[in-house]
């Protein structure tokens, strides 16, 4: 069921989405996003850039699934205790949604690092995430840069020296991609993405695509996780699309 709400001339609607049932729909970017921006003309685009891609996701775990607590920057426990694999995956991805027995969730985000109470993840990941600390997130899927929240299938983590936060990119190979959500909703992607996050391993022409609670991305076959397997993207200049995607990545 779709309840369209017109605010000015915003393209976004409220869409029922079971994967985020614990959040008010007004605060859930995926529920608001119709993925219905028009195909761009040459007047809507500027520079073409060559990129290579990986993806990241939001782990969704039980609140008492292990013995490793999430801790804040003051080294205080935040409540959830995860398995080693779950803790390390959460640290690597930068956020985690903790589900309680009623199916309600709370999202925690990367807060920084401190040397106290490290968790040894070196058997799981080559990148050292052992000192990661967390905080409660503002957005239901986690937070990005500059007070942006993450929006599934829209947010890109970029090297901000190459792609400035707030930039909108159009990826032709993404247009028309079909994404089936747990709720049964089928998204037909319009090809537009928003630079709203960063990552320690994201350098130069490497972008990381946020795919929500999915753990893989067969719907985006252009993501090869190989720096030699590139694709083309275009910087978008359409002010309305930029404004709408900025709004989508902002809490209110």
Sequence positions of predicted segments:
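Solvent-exposed, well-ordered loop and adjacent helix/strand elements within mature globular domains
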Residues: 18-252
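Bacterial N-terminal signal peptides that target proteins for export
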Residues: 1-5
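Bacterial N-terminal signal peptides
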Residues: 6-13
């Amino acid at each position: 069921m779709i309840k369209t709400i017109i605010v000015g001339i915003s393209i976004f609607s409220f869409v029922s989405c079971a994967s985020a049932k614990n959040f008010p729909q007004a605060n859930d970017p995926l529920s608001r996003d119709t993925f219905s921006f028009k195909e761009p003309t040459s007047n809507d685009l500027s520079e073409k850039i060559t990129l290579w891609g990986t993806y990241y996701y939001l782990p969704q775990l039980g609140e008492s699934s292990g013995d490793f607590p999430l801790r804040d920057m003051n080294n205080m426990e935040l409540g959830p205790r995860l398995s080693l694999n779950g803790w390390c995956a959460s640290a690597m991805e930068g956020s985690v949604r903790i589900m309680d027995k009623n199916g309600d969730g709370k999202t925690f985000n990367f807060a920084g690092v401190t040397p106290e109470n490290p968790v040894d993840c070196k058997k799981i990941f080559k990148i050292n995430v052992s000192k990661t600390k967390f905080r409660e997130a503002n957005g239901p899927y986690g937070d990005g840069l500059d007070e942006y929240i993450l929006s599934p299938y829209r947010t890109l983590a970029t090297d901000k020296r190459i792609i400035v936060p707030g930039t909108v990119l159009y990826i032709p190979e993404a247009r028309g991609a079909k994404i089936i959500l747990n709720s049964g909703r089928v998204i037909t992607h319009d090809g537009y993405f928003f630079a709203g996050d960063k990552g320690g391993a994201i350098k130069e022409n490497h972008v990381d695509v946020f795919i929500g609670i999915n753990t893989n991305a067969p719907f985006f076959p252009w993501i090869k996780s190989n720096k030699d397997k590139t694709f083309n993207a275009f910087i978008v200049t359409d002010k309305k699309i930029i404004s709408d995607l900025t709004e989508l990545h902002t809490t209110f």
